[in-house]
Amino acid sequence: MTDLTGILYIVATPIGNLQDITQRALETFAQVDLIAAEDTRHSGLLLSHYGIKKPFFALHDHNEQEKAHILVEKLKQGSNIALISDAGTPLISDPGFHLVRQCREAGIRVVPLPGACAAITALCASGIASDRFCFEGFLPAKSKARKDKLENIAEEDRTLIFYESTHRILDTLEDMQAVLGEERYIVLAREMTKTWETITGNTIKNLREWLLEDPNRTKGEMVLIVEGKPKSDNNDEISPQAVKALELIAEELPLKKAAAIVAELYGYKKNALYQFGLAHLEK
């Protein structure tokens, strides 16, 4: 690319409270030639609040693969473009992946501007472990597909983060209760940074019952933070994969060393694996 090639800016916008916009974002909006937005009417109101008037280009889930190349050509011709979503950080459960991929493949500079993200905002206030987490976005709309997805991640020991909508929250919690267990701890963060912001934690079963008590509690933008499945110290619950690994490694190394390696790989206590090996593997 030449020095005249434009820059694609990935710009985060507020998730509710308009005061959360960054100074750098406002300066970027002021200097770009075009703003690619998920919903041009919604974003028009947002930028109007800050006194910014710029041409818009509609880029959403239904047209991105078809239209991204148009923006790439504009960038090649020297236009600077800002990509925004309706709220929060673009590409996080929002359009933009295909555009960014095409820009990088074309050698166009992509500059991310950090800012609000509902998932991270909710996680940091949840009181659930935040050192390791797995963002899953929106679960499938149909119960069967939703349960299948939950079953695939039911054994995950990392914190799980989901987005959910008003009209599906109760059904989703019902399926979570069936697959993950009614006692799994969960935090619901609703309407983050807005007037009716609510952050509440309980077991999945109790949280669903709490929502049923007042229909207003099911309204708004929602983030679910689910505690990962705890590692068990019970020898009988050592996974088949861990047992197989222990068997294979113990053929080449002393059992104590094999137990230490498998413990590191699968998150079990070394002594639990060692005792299991003594009982089941040693001849």
From Swiss-Prot:
GO molecular function terms attached to this record: rRNA (cytosine-2'-O-)-methyltransferase activity
EC number: 2.1.1.198
Enzyme class: transferase
Keywords associated with the record: Cytoplasm, Methyltransferase, rRNA processing, S-adenosyl-L-methionine, Transferase
Signal peptide: none
Cellular component, GO annotation: cytoplasm
Compartment(s) of residence: Cytoplasm
Top-level taxonomic group: Bacteria
Gene3D superfamilies from the UniProt entry: Cobalt-precorrin-4 Transmethylase, Domain 1, Methyltransferase, Cobalt-precorrin-4 Transmethylase, Domain 2
Chemical reaction(s) catalysed: cytidine(1402) in 16S rRNA + S-adenosyl-L-methionine = 2'-O-methylcytidine(1402) in 16S rRNA + S-adenosyl-L-homocysteine + H(+)
Purpose: Catalyzes the 2'-O-methylation of the ribose of cytidine 1402 (C1402) in 16S rRNA.
Family listed: Belongs to the methyltransferase superfamily. RsmI family.
Classification via NCBIfam families: 16S rRNA (cytidine(1402)-2'-O)-methyltransferase
The name this protein goes by in its record: Ribosomal RNA small subunit methyltransferase I
Record gene name: rsmI
